[in-house]
Amino acid sequence: MQGARAPRDQGRSPGRMSALGRSSVILLTYVLAATELTCLFMQFSIVPYLSRKLGLDSIAFGYLQTTFGVLQLLGGPVFGRFADQRGARAALTLSFLAALALYLLLAAASSPALPGVYLLFASRLPGALMHTLPAAQMVITDLSAPEERPAALGRLGLCFGVGVILGSLLGGTLVSAYGIQCPAILAALATLLGAVLSFTCIPASTKGAKTDAQAPLPGGPRASVFDLKAIASLLRLPDVPRIFLVKVASNCPTGLFMVMFSIISMDFFQLEAAQAGYLMSFFGLLQMVTQGLVIGQLSSHFSEEVLLRASVLVFIVVGLAMAWMSSVFHFCLLVPGLVFSLCTLNVVTDSMLIKAVSTSDTGTMLGLCASVQPLLRTLGPTVGGLLYRSFGVPVFGHVQVAINTLVLLVLWRKPMPQRKDKVR
């Protein structure tokens, strides 16, 4: 194995893998992703309280959330292209520095001596560059073997689960004990440490030698990070539009439900804030287990096509049950199936889309994939609110069944192609 691995590293420049070994870089990437996600969910737990303290009503808070979603939606593909051109080190460092700016502005907004409302809205601006998870996915994609990739990407779900659980618990506990400003300051310190570790320990690039051969010559024209035509051209590659459409369509019903979940938990389930937090922690724990353990085992026994069809089929079953649920206990019974479908769909479609593009474009494609959730967070409050107000909770189950039945028929009529991984 060592002899086979040696040629793979010979083409790399000294600044690439010399800082840490391959496995150490992957492990550090997991730690950095978990740190950033923990800070992000700490921020999610304090922003509603801060906005209420500053006198914002529900409409203004909706504008605040929409602003963050739009900025992440627009910034995702551009950040991915930046990661492809400038490398993993620059991408992760930039993401952590943007997060640092956000948390510093958030801490300043909680100060009575400063214009809190303006600073709160200004704190949303760095969100355009906060894309640590896609950058981590790019590093793991570049450094993991093709057969190990679904499991390696799935283990990022452990990081997400850690972020949901620790971030929610730390945010609420610190706000109660030390005030709103404390979580923001702690998150700023953690992201500063993340920026330092990214700059000093992550390789300048994780791409293979063949990718470098495609780079522009010194003194020649360099492709722009903001070249939207180059970004959009990836969506016109063979099979990419269909895979991407499946990803967006199947995510849409669940995304609408999760955007409205805070309201549904209060109005429909009659939960207190602490109880809703416990339910989200349960959701995060299941996601950790599913992405960290279950998907890795399944991917070693079944093809991506089979797993994709299975996730859509489980979505349909969950949608049917969701249309009839009447209590939080019923929802808890549905959560394992919902989490399995959501995690499997995202991991498998991400893996398929990565295989469909060249190694020099993996970051851009992952940035496009990362824009799906901001898109749902942007449109979700309006569309989900209209559906909930007009038809109630069962409508989310009906929409889930209808859309995923169509997706399953498409997958059955024209199976996804089985691609071999690109030569590095």
From Swiss-Prot:
Gene3D superfamilies, A to Z: MFS general substrate transporter like domains (1.20.1250.20)
Listed GO CC annotations: apical plasma membrane; cytoplasm; membrane; nuclear envelope; plasma membrane
Coiled-coil portions: none
Segments traversing the membrane: 26-46, 59-79, 90-110, 156-176, 184-204, 243-263, 276-296, 312-332, 334-354, 391-411
InterPro entries to which the protein is assigned, alphabetical: MFS, MFS_dom, MFS_trans_sf, Tet-R_TetA/multi-R_MdtG-like
An annotated GO BP: organic cation transport
Tissues of expression: Expressed at high levels in adult and fetal kidney and liver, and adult colon. Expressed in fetal renal proximal tubules (at protein level). Expressed at lower levels in heart, brain and lung.
Entry membrane topology: Multi-pass membrane protein
CDD domains linked to this entry: MFS_SLC22A18
Keywords: Cell membrane, Disease variant, Membrane, Transmembrane, Transmembrane helix
Impact after mutating residue 233 to F: In lung cancer; somatic mutation
Annotated compartments: Apical cell membrane
A molecular function GO annotation: xenobiotic transmembrane transporter activity
Family assignment from sequence similarity: Belongs to the major facilitator (TC 2.A.1) superfamily. Organic cation transporter (TC 2.A.1.19) family.
Free-text function comment from the UniProt entry: May act as a transporter of organic cations based on a proton efflux antiport mechanism. May play a role in the transport of chloroquine and quinidine-related compounds in kidney. Plays a role in the regulation of lipid metabolism.
UniProt subunit comment: Interacts with RNF167.
Protein name: Solute carrier family 67 member A1
Species in which this protein is naturally found: Homo sapiens (Human)
